[in-house]
């Protein structure tokens, strides 16, 4: 018998400005039977002092400290200590709506679900602007929706036994993507509470804004593993679309926007396109391309025609 209904795991590194707001949103959840596992991943700031204050006041907070190993490693460590029936993840610079875990847990228990997914707010760093970002639900099959939708782990709860021995890769950018594909393809029952319940803070210091352009190639490791998986043939067309969406569009756009030389950009983009051609030679005929948003279809076609300067200009105008 699980001790708690939900265990929420929060990796902490360099978030002393934000961790108090994050913990406030968790200790005040309307679902009271919740375990809060805070993992200090060797942070050098004052986050631990803030965590200790909360841990003294709230008995359901489990404060753990480990050597720095990256966000994935911290999540794995937290999971080892979790006792909840369901598992959730929150990033230390984000926060959640006060009824998030009650709504997700109640939905899970209604139909004995393996995974429950919600929408989120995108929040500006000064907290002044919030925009709603609902989940992808274009298809009647929630399994397809989940695989084609957001690969973040923070807008979901997972039944503990569906995670099993699945772990996050350590010190890679795409740990959420890798973990999500593995767990979602193990799930039998998935559903949605499609309202914004998670508050995702968009800040310049976030991991994926790093200018080290070569690290974008780490996503290919995740796809290598997916292709080797015995379930690949069953989900081939979906995986191919994910490669279009994540390798061909998102990653190439990130490189185009990066502050590196033109030659370096070309080198990395060529590697990504070669990977697509070698592993998904018929990707241009994928039926799910039609499910791309209007803006992403435009970007897709610009990349196909190598109009990289136009893409950079679009994002420059959008930013400013």
For every predicted segment, state its role.
Residues 1-27:
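N-proximal low-complexity "stem/linker" segments adjacent to membrane-targeting elements
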Residues 3-6, 27-38, 46, 58-62:
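Short loop->beta transition adjacent to catalytic acidic/histidine clusters or analogous donor-positioning motifs
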Residues 25, 40-49, 91:
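A conserved acidic beta->alpha catalytic loop
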Residues 66-82:
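Glycine-rich, basic loop-to-helix element that forms the pyrophosphate-binding segment
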Residues 71-72, 92-192, 201-214:
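Donor-binding/catalytic cores of nucleotide-activated saccharide
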Residues 87:
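Short aromatic/hydrophobic "clamp" motif used to bind/position activated sugar donors
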Residues 197-203, 210-235, 249-250, 254, ...:
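Catalytic core of nucleotide-sugar-dependent glycosyltransferases
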Residues 260-320:
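Membrane-interface aromatic/basic loop that binds lipid-linked glycans or pyrophosphate carriers
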